[in-house]
């Protein structure tokens, strides 16, 4: 009996020692980080051509919804920050193109990340660079076609179009709305600055673990209904270079929230 008890005790000590030695390996190398933008209107999946009811009891139907995201920074678990190379950090998200709602940051250094910072729009420096420095998705004639004001020399940060039940009919078009939000503070004369930097902290204990062949995806909810909280379409159905664009920009800066993180 005593021998059995002794053998059991030795086995328990051995197993405990083994468990203590099981340490999660430190991530090494580098890898991709993907960010998926899930478009919603309140609790409903967002789709072009579908009716949605706002908090003001307006019925909205969208024909277009596009926006730029840029200038990404990843916040490390130890408080450090990795700044993604700026020249590669511009992306155009279009509701009409499913693949555009997933963006990938390449060659991110290994580590554990607990948050992401980004700009909704295009920063003032890039807005004022020579066209030769604005290629790819920022080329006004190709990648950024329809998202650039040639007459105002600046990018449209977010473009939303469609119909709304409380919009007035004008120019032969019934109940139409067009919200084109841009303006970066101005070059030769001051303007409104609608460049919005947002800080998204991962909920709970979620971390994006980069390295060791892992490719995390940050699942981000984008609730478009928040952009239209308390918007009076009878007054502001057409907003472009207008002071009210600041209200729309402040609203859409609240649309984004990280729901969870996959580490695959």
Role assignments for model-derived ranges:
Residues 1-4, 19-20:
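Positively charged n-region of N-terminal signal peptides that target proteins for export
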Residues 5-10:
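Sec-dependent signal peptide hydrophobic core
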Residues 14-17:
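C-terminal motif of bacterial Sec signal peptides marking the signal peptidase cleavage site
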Residues 19-264:
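A short, solvent-exposed, low-complexity linear motif enriched for acidic/polar residues
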């Amino acid at each position: 009996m005593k021998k059995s008890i002794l053998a059991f005790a030795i086995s328990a000590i051995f197993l405990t020692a083994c468990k203590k030695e099981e340490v999660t390996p430190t991530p090494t190398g580098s890898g991709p980080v993907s960010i998926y933008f899930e478009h919603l209107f309140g609790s409903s999946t967002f789709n072009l051509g579908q009716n949605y009811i706002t908090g003001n009891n307006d019925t909205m139907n969208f024909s277009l919804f596009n926006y730029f995201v840029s200038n990404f920074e990843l916040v490390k678990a130890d408080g450090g920050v990795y700044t993604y190379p700026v020249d590669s950090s511009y992306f155009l998200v279009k509701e009409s193109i499913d693949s555009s709602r997933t963006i990938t940051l390449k060659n991110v250094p290994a580590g554990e990340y607990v948050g992401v910072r980004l700009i909704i729009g295009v920063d003032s420096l890039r807005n004022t660079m020579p066209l030769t420095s604005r290629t790819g998705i920022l080329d006004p004639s190709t990648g950024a076609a329809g998202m650039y004001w040639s007459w105002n020399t600046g990018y449209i940060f977010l473009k939303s179009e469609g119909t709304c039940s409380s919009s007035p009919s004008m120019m032969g078009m019934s109940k139409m709305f067009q919200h084109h939000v841009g303006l970066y503070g101005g070059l030769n004369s001051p303007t409104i600055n609608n460049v919005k930097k947002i800080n998204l902290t991962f909920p709970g204990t979620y971390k994006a673990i980069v390295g060791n062949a892992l490719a995390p995806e940050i699942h981000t909810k984008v609730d478009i209904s928040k952009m239209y909280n308390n918007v009076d379409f009878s007054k502001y159905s057409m907003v472009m270079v207008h002071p009210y664009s600041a209200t729309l920009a402040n609203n859409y800066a609240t649309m984004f929230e990280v729901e969870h993180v996959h580490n695959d």
